[in-house]
From Swiss-Prot:
Gene (UniProt): matK
Swiss-Prot/TrEMBL keywords: Chloroplast, mRNA processing, Plastid, RNA-binding, tRNA processing
Name of the protein described by the UniProt record: Maturase K
Biological processes, Gene Ontology terms: mRNA processing; RNA splicing; tRNA processing
Organism the protein comes from: Lathyrus tingitanus (Tangier pea)
Function: Usually encoded in the trnK tRNA gene intron. Probably assists in splicing its own and other chloroplast group II introns.
Amino acid sequence: MKEYQVYLERARSRQQDFLYPLLFREYIYGLAYSHNLNRSIFLENVGYDNKYSLLIVKRLITRMYQQNHLIISANDSNKNTLGGYNPILDSQIISEGFAIVVEIPFLRQLSSSLEEEKILQSYKNLRSIHSIFPFLEDKFTYLHYVSDIRIPYPIHLEILVQILRYWVKDAPFFHLLRLFLYNFCNWNSFFTTKKWISTFSKSNPRLFLFLHNFYVCEYESIFVFLRTKSSHLRLKSFSVFFERIFFYAKREHLVKVFSKDFSYTLTFLKDPNIHYVRYQGKCILASKNAPFLMNKWKHYFIHLWQCFFDLWSQPRMININPLSEHSFQLLGYFLNVRLNRSVVRSQMLQNTFLIEMVIQNLDIIVPIIPLIRSLAKAKFCNILGEPISKPVWADSSDFDIIDRFLRICRNLSHYYNGSSKKKSLYRIKYILRLSCIKTLACKHKSTVRAFLKRSGSEELLQEFFTEEQEILSFIFPRDSSTWQRLHRNRIWYLDILFSNDLVHDE
């Protein structure tokens, strides 16, 4: 926020948001360079002098002033960079500038709506990935039906630009953005639409994520309700871009939602026990009542995507399943509801009754098979789960090799400490431990048995099986009530802002 302060002050002094002139300012591309994940596009003589080249930006801005420079044909894209400019390189730099410029008015609105960082302090716990699981444990154990929905994509480019135009009034900027997006699409015309989205997301992840957030924000502004109240939905607060997880509470009133492109009114029936959760590109809808209302919501989603966003979605792609019979994958876990039945004897005077009770518990399981596939993809084992050596790391020191394996193992243990069955992680720890031993043996050109005979090696590798409870015993005494409670229950951490690369949803 601090590095944008100068440009926010300039924007506040203006009556309207004029973003177009900012694309011709050198400091915008300097900010883009400082945030860019692929900084090589701003470098001159890549691999020799890794310094930000202001000359490249100046030449680009000069060419941008020329008429029809941004209209680039397919033949221009193959031009030799040594004999002239490279249009592909120019497009990547311009897209980085777009990503910085388009965020400025929203940062301005965010800084004015939030009292600097005071309100953001209350959202810190919600930013943790694990904050969603206590919510699921508290709510989903009382629900009966669930619908696991993947938000469809890609969205049409013109609709994407129109969504942005609703928030920012700057016609020249959006004409240029539309021209840039369509030209990029034409360069890759031999790709299908999904492949184009994949290519664009890799070439400029910052701009892609920003546009994708706007798409999700627009669709959720119609169907997703704020936690405290329901209203004619149009999101005003942009704290949505700071929270990684969005979950919303129960609905209390009848709500009518008006969509600008619909010729009819969407009316939502009151259901006090329906919940909506979204993370990344997946949303989960759960309800306690019969699946009638769930089918209503299902058709609302389908009609919205088809009529408002021009995205074809078939009804059979959204399934409504009993929560007790269906497990769904979320954030690297398998979740389902386990029914625990018990019989209670009740006696009243001389009569005795047997009462059967059913208690629902949310069962959160570590997905061992997907984890083994991830380990096999990372070359720690084969597809059958048999550990193999990691020759790429053999050039490092013994301490660095062991530290790398331990860091991966501890991160996985830290992430999956909320699982119902933690013993299933022993197989993952075994694979990493034996892979570490084989890597060290490969480095020293010896067998695994000969390496294990070395003094201290086996004791050092025992850290792979260090239990979380043993770590907690250093913080709390073993005879304390706090340690006993933590020893029995699962532990969710509110400091996990991103998942390990080995943890992913397929």
